């Protein structure tokens, strides 16, 4: 499943305990008149089918014991103990019915058994999955799908299928009074949050943006991270390590990777300390650090960046950039820039790609000339949330477009030393949180024996493995062994 990074683990009890505290922390306490925030429990329920067919997967023949002891306890705890205000229904089907149209899940279990009286909203596009050809195909059209979803208790849709509710009422597929039930829940929530009143009347609007990533919050996060770590084994009392003449080897594909620590559906932190950086900082002046990546995530290969072999037509290092405040590149660019390092652009946190460029509804074109100093296979590595295309010598060699978070895309080219290659990368984005990472490099096979030789004198080896958001993300296209995306 593409969003495993966001979960609290597979243990129903621990997930329940952590989830309840997160909900309480998010929602806070009512100030006497207004709620601070409404948290949402997701995705309800049995949402752990294969990523690649999530829009048509049917979770069936679930034994009652599995349902009530494995899949449902965290949701029940969030409703009964956490008093969560919202629940999101999942993409998949449950026992034949789409979760957002399941009376069993939304009416019998959630509302009748647990007493939930808040809002149920759909995952984005989930109602359209009822009738789309590449979805469940349980309903013939948007009118039937939207009527069924509302009647099953889905009050709010992330999407546009509910626009058909007017016609559904006219066709007699649903009574207007049933729609009124959902509308009442939605308006009740908005009144509770103070959305219908002047901002100055709502105490929560006085919280300044400056608290985000503030020194106090950073300190608390660090303290929480330290106190929440669990040491499972300490064979021969290896820990704590003693400084002074210590040689530490740090290995693994995630050792020097910031993105690995962010998860997915993440904000962009103002700074990140990689595990390699953290160990380096912790060592004393008499200690020695050896960094040897040693392997990739799933392949016996590493990418050695050759971004420094790229120059623009006028001889400047890196890529020239042109930006438009529209997605069609109409008119003259609003600004130009020179990008001298591998791309790490993201609009999260209201950070623009360049001064004067929109946060949404913008496009960009990057150009450079790549002149390799050796022959071999060069990988053009793209990780993007948005749409675009890569051209080499005027020919489009790779296109990309995605709707949910970052997507990894790559193109491999056999190059000759001294030959020039015109590189052009287009990018455009309509919504918020645009993301574009780009680099190029030679793909070198990992020689495990050489890596072992380089770290043989280390007193201890710290290996940092696991997966990464570069491998695992929602509806993320992955072209690597062992992953179907």
Region locations from a protein language model:
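Glycoside hydrolase catalytic-domain context in secreted enzymes
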Residues: 1-485
């Amino acid at each position: 499943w593409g969003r495993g990074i966001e979960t609290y683990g597979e243990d129903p009890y621990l997930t329940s305990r952590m989830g309840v505290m997160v909900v309480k922390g998010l929602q806070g306490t009512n100030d006497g008149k207004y709620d601070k925030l409404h948290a949402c429990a997701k995705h309800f329920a049995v949402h752990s089918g294969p990523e690649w067919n999530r829009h048509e997967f049917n979770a069936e023949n679930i034994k009652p014991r599995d349902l009530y002891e494995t899949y449902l306890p965290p949701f029940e705890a969030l409703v009964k103990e956490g008093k969560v205000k919202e629940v999101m229904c999942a993409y998949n089907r449950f026992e034949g019915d789409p979760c957002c149209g399941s009376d069993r899940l939304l009416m019998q279990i959630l509302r009748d058994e647990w007493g939930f009286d808040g809002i149920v909203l759909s995952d984005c596009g989930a109602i359209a999955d009822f009738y789309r050809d590449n979805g469940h195909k349980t309903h013939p059209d948007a009118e039937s799908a939207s009527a069924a979803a509302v009647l099953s208790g889905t009050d709010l849709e992330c999407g546009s299928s509910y626009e058909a509710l007017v016609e559904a009422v006219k066709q007699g597929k649903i009574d207007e009074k049933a729609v009124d039930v959902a509308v009442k829940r939605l308006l009740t929530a908005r009144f509770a949050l103070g959305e219908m009143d002047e901002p100055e009347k709502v105490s929560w609007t006085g919280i300044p943006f400056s608290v985000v990533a503030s020194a106090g919050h950073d300190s608390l996060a660090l303290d929480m991270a330290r106190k929440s770590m669990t040491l499972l084994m300490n064979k021969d009392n290896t820990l704590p390590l003693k400084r002074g003449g210590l040689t530490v080897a740090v290995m693994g594909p995630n050792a020097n990777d910031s993105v690995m620590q962010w998860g997915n559906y993440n904000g962009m932190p103002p700074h990140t300390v990689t595990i390699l950086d953290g160990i380096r900082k912790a060592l004393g002046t008499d200690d020695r650090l050896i960094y040897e990546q040693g392997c990739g995530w799933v392949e016996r290969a590493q990418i050695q960046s050759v971004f420094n072999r790229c120059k623009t037509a006028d001889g400047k290092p890196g890529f020239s950039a042109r930006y438009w405040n529209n997605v069609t590149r109409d008119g003259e660019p609003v600004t130009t820039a020179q990008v001298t390092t591998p791309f790490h652009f993201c609009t999260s946190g209201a950070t623009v790609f360049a001064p004067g460029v929109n946060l949404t509804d913008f496009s960009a074109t990057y150009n450079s000339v790549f002149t390799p100093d050796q022959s071999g296979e060069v990988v053009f590595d793209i990780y993007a949330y948005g749409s675009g295309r890569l051209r080499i010598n005027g020919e489009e060699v790779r296109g990309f477009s995605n709707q949910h978070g970052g997507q990894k895309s790559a193109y491999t080219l056999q190059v000759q030393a001294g030959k020039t290659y015109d590189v052009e990368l287009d990018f455009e984005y309509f919504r918020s949180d645009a993301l574009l990472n780009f680099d190029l490099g030679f793909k070198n096979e990992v020689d495990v024996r050489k890596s072992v030789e380089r770290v043989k004198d280390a007193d201890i080896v710290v290996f940092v493995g696991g997966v990464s958001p570069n491998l695992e993300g929602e509806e993320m296209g992955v072209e690597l062994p062992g992953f179907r995306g």
